[in-house]
Design a protein with these regions (language model features):
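Core catalytic lobe of class I
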Residues: 1-224, 228-233
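Short, conserved SAM-binding/catalytic segment
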Residues: 235-238
Length: 238
């Protein structure tokens, strides 16, 4: 279920400790040309707003469950969000900084091509659910180079660098949103930190990629998107 409403209004309707996983991709602050990324007069105002929805996400998240926040380091704003907002949430523990790497798009002749986006993982408490066997990937080598070591038949656990070149598993929906994320990577997050029937929340659901991933993995999705055009697209996808 995706609602066409403001994220704080949506979160206010959720009870404490009722969500199993939060995965969200907030506005970056003056990175994308769209109006939704340029609605704050200053970085300070933007971070104050981030603190409000982050606090609400922590409130609704169950203990020992995870919060994932997508971002970009094209500017220092995402770093300040980590240091001045997430790190100041007393219940939350930093766990990982994941990189989504890709190889499409233009190049500059003046610097190395920047081809990645960032993903912060925090848990509510030191312990958290992590179902490693659900997200294993094939080994590159067929046999271990170490003597007496057998490779896991299910594959290896991914590193914190996730290469993935296409935005979605369906070309039909590629490009529906300027900051769209690959459904396959969202499925990985969901499988790692939830069980079937658990509740997954995305408060900036865009064109609905997280909702699609939740549906494909038999989870309950709850989310919102304030932009009516993107909300309508997400409804079509589902």
């Amino acid at each position: 279920m995706i609602q066409n409403k403001d994220c704080l209004d949506f979160l206010s309707e959720l009870e404490d400790d009722t969500v199993d996983l939060v995965v969200t991709d907030p506005p970056y602050f003056q990175i994308v040309k769209n109006e939704w990324d340029n609605q704050w007069s200053s970085e300070e105002e933007y971070l104050e707003w981030c603190a409000k929805w982050t606090t609400e996400c922590v409130r609704v998240l169950k203990p020992n469950r995870c919060l994932y926040v997508w971002g970009t380091t094209k500017t220092d704003t995402f770093l300040r969000y980590k240091l001045d907002v997430l790190n100041k949430q007393p219940e939350m523990v930093y766990q990982s900084w994941i990189i989504w790497s890709y190889d499409w798009g233009g190049r500059t002749k003046k610097n190395f091509a920047r081809k990645h986006e960032d993903l912060l993982m925090y848990s509510k408490g030191k312990d958290y659910l992590f179902k490693s066997d659900e997200i294993r990937i094939p080994y590159i080598m067929k046999k271990s180079v170490r003597k007496g070591v057998e490779l896991n038949a299910l594959g290896k656990i991914p590193t914190d660098v996730w290469p993935k070149n296409n935005h979605t598993t369906s070309k039909e929906y590629c490009g529906w949103h300027p900051t769209q994320k690959p459904v396959e990577l969202l499925e990985r997050i969901i499988k790692a930190h939830t069980n079937e029937g658990d509740v997954v929340v995305d408060i900036f659901s865009g064109s609905g990629s997280t909702a699609v991933a939740a549906k494909k993995t038999n989870r309950i999705f709850k989310g919102c998107e304030q932009d009516k055009t993107y909300w309508e697209k997400s409804v079509l996808r589902l």
